[in-house]
């Protein structure tokens, strides 16, 4: 599934939110990426798609929690070429419960803090009902890919998808 949604709020007016989800994608991850506005001028002499990328703030929700701030910085050397670098904030807790352990533990203890309230569920279904009834044809994609090519076209005007690169906690790089 890939779609663009807008939040009906003065604070988020005109800001697109791109959502992508699927089965058997290249990587299992849950991330929120906030792309900042690109500078009004080209800062470095390099060319290519990475040269035009804006800075961003990435929140990795799973498989581990982490935050990364990405900025284009000058690559070491005489050439005035930029590199995208991420500064990571990790909160490694060796005895931390997995999300399912915590959820089940809270359910058994009667703690409803991690569970969605009824009014929030109804609001979510009000949005999803429209998606389900006004759906587009299903687009097939190759297992192990990032999804159908049509999903890429949805965000081309805003610079394309930022695919999850690696697990920020362990540093395991995705291929």
Region roles according to the model:
Residues 1-175:
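Secretory/organelle targeting and membrane-embedding segments
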């Amino acid at each position: 599934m890939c779609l663009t949604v807008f939040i009906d709020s003065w604070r988020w007016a005109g800001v697109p939110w791109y959502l992508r989800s699927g089965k058997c994608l290249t990587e299992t991850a849950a991330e929120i990426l906030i792309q900042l506005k690109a500078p009004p001028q080209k800062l470095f002499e390099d060319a290519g798609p990475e040269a035009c990328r804006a800075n961003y703030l990435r929140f990795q929700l799973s498989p581990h929690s982490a935050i990364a701030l990405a900025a284009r910085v000058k690559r070491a050397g005489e050439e005035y070429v930029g590199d995208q670098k991420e500064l990571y904030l990790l909160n490694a807790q060796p005895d931390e419960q997995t999300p399912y352990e915590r959820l089940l533990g809270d359910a058994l203890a009667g703690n409803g803090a991690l569970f969605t309230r009824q009014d929030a569920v109804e609001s979510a279904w009000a949005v999803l009902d429209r998606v389900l009834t006004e759906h587009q044809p299903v687009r097939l994609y190759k297992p192990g890919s990032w999804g159908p090519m049509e999903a890429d076209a949805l965000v081309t005007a805003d610079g394309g998808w930022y695919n999850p690169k690696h697990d920020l906690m362990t540093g395991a790089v995705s291929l």
